[in-house]
A protein has these predicted regions:
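Short domain-boundary/entry signatures in modular proteins, especially
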Residues: 13-19, 203
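Short beta-strand-centered segments at strand-helix junctions
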Residues: 21, 26-67, 74-119, 124-151, ...
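Short coil-to-beta-strand transition motifs
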Residues: 163-165
Length: 203
């Protein structure tokens, strides 16, 4: 049975079809900011593994405060990073009164600002808020099969009841990646994504 499943998954992958995952608003914390928000010696408590190996949803939550509003119980994804990064949808930014650029994850220089509130402290994040560029995580063997390269831009057609073709989708290749496409809730709602959904990579 497992061999049959592997053959089916392989056939889907060779067709350039990728599972689409929807990312809600979340934050990645630096070790320093983690200690400020949750107290000295605090660490993240894994709650559920994510599709990308080594990444997880934590038990801990924070509040985000903008000039027009706040979002409570915002998810923290682990493990900790070298710098704090907040990923919001455009709708989130409008509701919070935050200005954030469309960026690749990790590119936070000159990005948006926000206040992050935890149970033990608050940080005024002067930069680090972005609207994440939609992207596809690709392991090297899949990249070779589909002739994809790291940093390449492609189009992806969302195979839903309201099909949409996203242009300028970023390809990210790494040996630790699982083959998945990530979009935010604004994009998912526009394409009527509901449950298991595939996207077709178009070069």
């Amino acid at each position: 049975m497992q061999n049959l499943m592997d053959q089916i998954v392989g056939a889907i992958t060779r067709s350039g079809l990728v599972e689409v995952e929807v990312s809600a608003r979340h934050i990645h914390l630096s070790e320093r900011d983690m200690q400020i928000l949750f107290g000295d010696g605090a660490s993240l408590t894994p709650k559920r593994d994510l599709s990308q190996p080594g990444q997880y949803l934590s038990e801990e939550r924070v509040n985000l405060i903008g000039t027009k509003g706040r979002k409570e119980h915002v998810a923290i994804l682990g493990p900790v990073r070298s710098s704090t990064q907040v990923e919001l949808s455009k709708s989130d930014c409008v509701e919070l009164g935050v200005t954030a650029p469309l960026r690749e994850s990790g590119d936070v220089k000159g990005s948006g600002s926000i206040i992050v509130e935890g149970p033990c402290g608050t940080i005024n994040l002067t930069e680090g808020v972005i609207i994440a560029q939609n992207h596809v995580h690709v392991p090297p063997e899949t990249a070779q099969m589909l002739e994809l390269k790291d940093k390449q831009r492609v189009c992806v057609e969302i195979m839903s009841e309201r099909p949409i073709i996203f242009k300028n989708v970023l390809i990210r290749v790494h040996k630790n990646f699982t083959f998945r496409m990530h979009i935010d809730f604004d994009e998912a709602n526009a394409a009527a994504v509901n449950g298991f959904t595939l996207g077709k990579i178009i070069k």
